Amino acid sequence: MIRKHTRRAAKAAFAISLGVAIVLGGSAAAATKRPAAAPTIVIGTKNFTEEFVLGQLYKQALEAAGFKVSYDENIGSSELIDTAITSGKINFYPEYTGVIVQDLAHKTSPSTAAATYAAAKAFEQTRGLTLLNSTPFYDSDSFGMLTSTAKKLGVTTIADMKKVKSFSFAGYPECRTRVTCLVGLKKVYGLTQAKFVPLASISVYTLLDEGKITAGDVFSTDPQLGESKYTVLTDTKHVFGFQNVAPVVSQKVLAAAGPKFAQVVNAVSAKLTIPAMIAMNKAVAIDKDTPAVVAAGFLKANHLN
């Protein structure tokens, strides 16, 4: 996944435990049981809107539960943030399970979302990391174009693009070397005629609207896809894989933080449906709200902070 797939009584429990500590004279024994005594959770995010929202959701929920959190936003691509967590610069970040399997472990995409999660978790555990629960929503790379272009070319699936003599396809620079992007499109679908256009600061949707590209790498939770103006071609060969989000966390930090840590994170993940993520992505990307404000509103609405 290149970019792009937010939602306690724990706060009350923390307040109660704090009250007990005060009644007991603020004993050291009581204080060591509080989440605040756990190691600092160093959260990192990749370099796109959805990751900023996810990072804020986990950050704010953990802070509300009493954990100390350090936040490092916009680290970069999957490869860069993977280096950050394996080097110990961060110890937690949200990742897409298919990206772990295909782009980091360099394995073939499994045939189901559950198998993809299992393979991703097994890979991370060989490196001193692990995965917490995955989200209901998935956000995979997708082959997007203007609906008018799709109709003109007579295409509904990615495989149909084989009959198009030549076309341009835009994506982030790392798309060029990814199995879940241009490499897969060429090897699996045989789209060797595709001319790659690397994205810099301009949106793929802007390039589509201006007629500067034929198609581009979009994401299934992009708010723009709610408009009939754009069409996503069906990925019949599953090049883009299964891309549910699962927090990657250091095994040492997970053990030291105690069971409450995983409970808080998993409770947030469980609420992150496709409609919820599309709405939050829209609030940030189109309505120009900040990820922090959007995340706070979602957590409050779902009683997670």
Where are these predicted regions, by residue range?
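Short, well-ordered beta-strand elements
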Residues: 37-50, 68-73, 165-171
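Ligand-binding "clamshell"
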Residues: 104-132, 210-212, 224-238
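Short helix-initiation/N-cap motifs at beta->coil->alpha
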Residues: 71-83, 194-206
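Short, low-complexity disordered leader/linker segments with a strong preference
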Residues: 1-40
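Immediate post-signal peptide segment of exported/extracytoplasmic ligand-binding proteins
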Residues: 30-42, 62-63, 159-168, 300-305
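A conserved helix-loop-strand patch within extracytoplasmic ligand-binding domains
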Residues: 113-169, 251, 270-274
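Periplasmic-binding protein-like
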Residues: 128-129, 135-142, 221-268
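Ligand-binding cleft/hinge of the Venus flytrap
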Residues: 58-65, 158-167, 171, 175-194, ...
